[in-house]
Amino acid sequence: MNENIIKLINDICWWIPFRSKRNLLRNQLISTITDNMHVKNREIYQFIKKTIDLTTNCDDLETKKRIFKENICLVEIGIFSYCNRKCWFCPNSVIDRHSDNIQLKEEIFLKILNELKDINYSNGIRLHRYNEPLYDIELLIKRIKQVKEYLPNCKIQINTNGDYLNLEYLIDLKDAGIDSMLINYYYNGSDKNIEFNLPQIKSNMNKLMQKLKLNYHIDNESDNSIIMKSKYYNIDITYSSINMNILGCDRGGVIDVKSKIRTAPCFHPNMQVSIDYDGIYTLCCNIRSDVKEHENYLIGNVENNNIFELFTSDKIIEFRKHLLRGNSKKIGACTYCSM
């Protein structure tokens, strides 16, 4: 143990008049600090090991599966394309997700689930990507049940704007087996000049909670955001409203929001898989396969490739090497990312 730490422990204990008690406290402090140092050393070792795994080329499929399972916390799948809104802070304001509704092929969806089943995946599954999942409730319920069949231990999440949400849908979602739902209240989705008026926003959010017959509490509120929490049987419900003028993200350079050049490292491609409705695996949740400027950030198609191969591909490894560098300016779609 470091001599300075020993000296500090002695300084703490010196005033105890009885040698036996003084030595007892001294030994307890040394033991506690030593144990904590061992824990911290193990954490550092695991972090280094994972970083090496995620930035090193590998040919063995079983090793690729291990790396995936040890790192991925969330798999995000767009089961269809349609969204009923064109919010200014979303790429759907400039990309057409309104004219047609294109479904992810069922065989691709089941292929993803089958591959995840092969490693007993038990972390998060999010069934939406820049679409409104409740627009097609029948398909959503079907996909939830399929996830439950293939991956019974995973946690199923959905994000919704709440426009279609009613008590009947909530009951259907509960019966199907989702674990959590994030409802977003977009107070200025159609007009970015509408100010964040907290009393008015709270009043409007309360109307939906009353409609759903849900009790709730305010988990957090500030000058630019409010988060309500509720529970419906086994569904954890978060209802939030955020001032996107202040807290919004540029979504890979598509949206003009105030943000500084990013120099912090990014870990999203290490922990999350994002798959669009066309089966394209993208670098992160901010990258979309239907944005032309994002073409270089598309990792591959899960229809023709194993998800573990894509997660450990040469292309994504090179992105990780760049994104993991601290105190260095990020480039391209990542330049102004605030997530």
Which residue ranges define each predicted feature?
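N-terminal pre-core extensions flanking Radical SAM catalytic domains
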Residues: 4-98, 259, 285, 305-339
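Conserved glycine-rich "GG(E/T)P / GGGxP" loop and the immediately following alpha-helix
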Residues: 67-251
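C-terminal accessory region of radical SAM enzymes
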Residues: 206-256, 286-336
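Nucleotide-sugar-dependent
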Residues: 262-264
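Short, small/polar residue-rich loop motifs at catalytic or cofactor-binding pockets
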Residues: 266-269
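Short, acidic, Ser/Thr-enriched surface-loop or helix-capping motifs
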Residues: 275-276
